[in-house]
Amino acid sequence: MFQTFRNAWKIPELKNRLLFTLAILVVYRLGCAIPVPFVSGSALTQMFANGDMLSYLNMMSGGALARCTLFALGVTPYINASIIVQLLTVAIPALENLAKEADGQQKLQQINRYAGAVVALIMSIGYYFVIRNMGALKYVSGAAGVFAAVVIIATFVAGAQLITWAGEQIDDKGIGNGISLLIFASIVSNWSSLYTSVTGLLTRAAAGEPQFYILLPVLVILALVAVVFVVVMTNAERRITIQYAKRVVGRKQMGGQNSYLPLKLNMSGVMPIIFASALVSIPGTIGSFLQIDQQAHPVWYAFFHTFNYTSWLYVVIYLLLILAFNYFYVAIQYNPVEIANNLRRNNGSIPGFRPGKPTSDFITRTLNKITLIGAIFLAAVAVLPIILGNLTGMSIQLGGTSLLIVVGVALDTTRSLDSFMTMRNHKGFLG
């Protein structure tokens, strides 16, 4: 491993890309520490310690939301905008045709930026009122209050756009996927909170609950097993054999070779979890924004509290949405009829199935089986940490979404680095 890094460091272009990526990540973490003007960050600490949806969003922003800093919104506006644009691409024919054009992806990326700015503005306004309701603002009335509101909201929006720009710079000049690496950095920065959870278990064990001495190593083993499980399932794929008929082009014989069609078990990645989280967290987030008083409005308080991410109703709805959106995203990404037609045009076929409808039907059946297994995998990884946290009373920061993102980004970045080195005849991680 260390030899591989030394070999990578000897390649000037790769060295520059690694340094550039590291520099962007350092700047991102510095931005997470720059406070927004006119806000008292200490007044917000208690609100984010209650385990509600804002606490979850704070984890995804690397703690910047609780400290009310420049990058408080994190990459959430960009992710939500990307989801909206993807759904509109399926629903609106003009956008669907645009996605198929040569330069269509660049135009869609520009639409993503504008949509991300709108989402960031909406979230900034909502978070401003949360800060105001918590009494964390230095100026709330008069011209000073208006000026403070404009500055705070503009700072949040500018920070969100700057994060989007930083992610795109990593895509162009660095290694790996920029936005994914920024999320990775945010999640990893919160791992220090695991130390607090561990010391809490040891304290309870020393106070007369010796079962926690057994629980701690069990949790460590389960975490390691979960990481291995996610790595294996993320890389798992079903390979369908493809045979190409021989044909003569000029004086050369073409084809006659066997290949395969790879169908990954987790084809949709973490997107179903992110989208399901966005939908099921809306009531809880609104409740956090409104700061409803339990004594004055007990019914509304109970309703919004029901959608707290540690409640059992949240777990059930979350699980069902993950299953549904996993099928939805696979249906968007894969068209069995189009795959079958492409195979026919290239003189390819699946052994035992005639070209055309029989081939597309077989691919459809295979996709349905794989999608079911992948959906169960995603649901288990996302929901089990929440259930475990409810049963043990621990605040498990490394949830299913975090685990999938961390493992997925690590694997993708490793592949990118290995591919870069393989092109220069260097032995990489996977070789």
What function would you assign to each model-found segment?
Residues M1-A99, D103-G431:
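N-terminal cationic and glycine-rich segments that engage phosphates or anionic surfaces
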